[in-house]
Amino acid sequence: MKASISTKLDQLAERLDEVNALLAREDATANMDQYRKLSREHAELSPVAEQYGQYRQAQDDLATAQALLDDPEMKEFAADEIDAARERLQSLENSLQTLLLPKDPNDDRNLLLEIRAGTGGEESALFAADLLRMYTRYAERRRWQVEIMSESPSDLGGYKEVIVRIAGDAAFSRLKFESGGHRVQRVPATESQGRIHTSACTVAVMPEADEVGEVEINPSDLRVDTFRASGAGGQHVNKTDSAVRLTHLPTGIVVECQDDRSQHRNKEKAMKVLAARIKDMQLRAAQAKEANTRRNLIGSGDRSDRIRTYNFPQGRVTDHRINLTLYKIDMIMDGDLDELISALSAEHQADQLAALGEES
């Protein structure tokens, strides 16, 4: 094990002792915020310290076995013990390196998923609806909740733009690599000659701010417009200005919500989307800065990056970031995304491990 990693592990073990002492104090629960913070830190440090303890025990076992090599009667036994200890040490070192990887603080958050039709006109809007169904089915498989926050339907039942909130266990950690350009190649329903068309959508996955107040939005930086919601008319036509448009002047971000009949509810939804977009902008700026100093294969989430192609005639889906092609497009479009997502997560972890090796 590299000296820098060993030093880091010693420091974490010492910190766990300090946290244990603080949690054992009689007045530990006097400040509940501090108590919860220490409890979370304890939960994060304990697995690392436990594995490091096993690693040090394996080091002791190796030293003991090596000392037995000089004894002719114990030589064969000692050689077997040395092989076993070395194998155990390597396995534990790999586990410890993984545990030391930087945690994404947003991994446990809920998220806002935004799908926008791009090149390809009505076919692109129809594909946006297909992508929404794909992610909704995936969410259902994982027992997550999906709520439409804002939608702009197209004439043929697709979406020019749709934003949904997805809430559930580790939702952002599973879907955060979906940001980018999604390209589809297929014969559109509107095509009479049977020609294959190429169109595209962009997907943005944004961690939800725990509270809108988590993202600082100065009221003076906000322009609020209300207007009458558009709809199909009839008896449910909206006769009040319930639709809300928020414009964040410093960034130029504009959010509209008109799906609810309550202006208050529409404004509440719009504020959630606005806060997530501002937070996402801040995250991408930080990631761009990080990418200047080291390779960041998966996590850039640049909207202009074409990340995936869905080729219906060939029945394949290709993720261009990791050169993975799967010939099960129907299953994937029905929400079977785990193989894709797990491969992306594994590549990201390998990228982090390589960076950890460079730093140490």
UniProtKB/Swiss-Prot annotation:
A Pfam family that the UniProt record links to this protein: PCRF
Record has Cytoplasm as a keyword: yes
Gene Ontology terms, MF aspect: translation release factor activity, codon specific
Keyword vocabulary terms for this entry: Cytoplasm, Methylation, Protein biosynthesis
GO cellular component: cytoplasm
Compartment annotation: Cytoplasm
SMART domains: PCRF
Residue numbers carrying N5-methylglutamine: 235
Keyword Cytoplasm: yes
Post-translational modification remark: Methylated by PrmC. Methylation increases the termination efficiency of RF1.
Entry similarity comment: Belongs to the prokaryotic/mitochondrial release factor family.
Record function comment: Peptide chain release factor 1 directs the termination of translation in response to the peptide chain termination codons UAG and UAA.
Protein name listed in UniProt: Peptide chain release factor 1
Native organism: Cupriavidus metallidurans (strain ATCC 43123 / DSM 2839 / NBRC 102507 / CH34) (Ralstonia metallidurans)
